[in-house]
Amino acid sequence: MKYICFWEFKPEDFDKMIEKYKQAMEGREKVPEKFPKILFGPYSLGGEWKGFTVYEDATPEQMTNLILHYTPEEKMKFVPIFEGAKFIEIYMKMKK
């Protein structure tokens, strides 16, 4: 399953966030299964201190590890995302 993670932080925490991001990337190299696999991103929303990242096959433990790594500076919200064609297929089966 894929998840989109919306994140945001305060401008005054930007230096801390850069350091935490570097630590997370190094951690991914050493222990790849600690955090969810990045499918694409992170992307920031223009002119704002927030953005999103899409993760693939994220387990609850990996999501928790990621949240705890960036806490308290960053707020995160994980939302499952579905392929439109698959969603329609399941919906049509349910209608029968």
Task: Please annotate each region the language model reported.
Residues 1-50, 58-62, 83-96:
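Short S/T/G/P-rich N-terminal loop/turn motif that feeds into the first structured element of a domain
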Residues 24, 63-72:
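Short amphipathic alpha-helices in soluble, non-transmembrane regions
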Residues 50-52, 75:
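Short active-site oxyanion
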Residues 73-84:
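Conserved short beta-strand edge segments in small beta-sheet-based binding/regulatory domains
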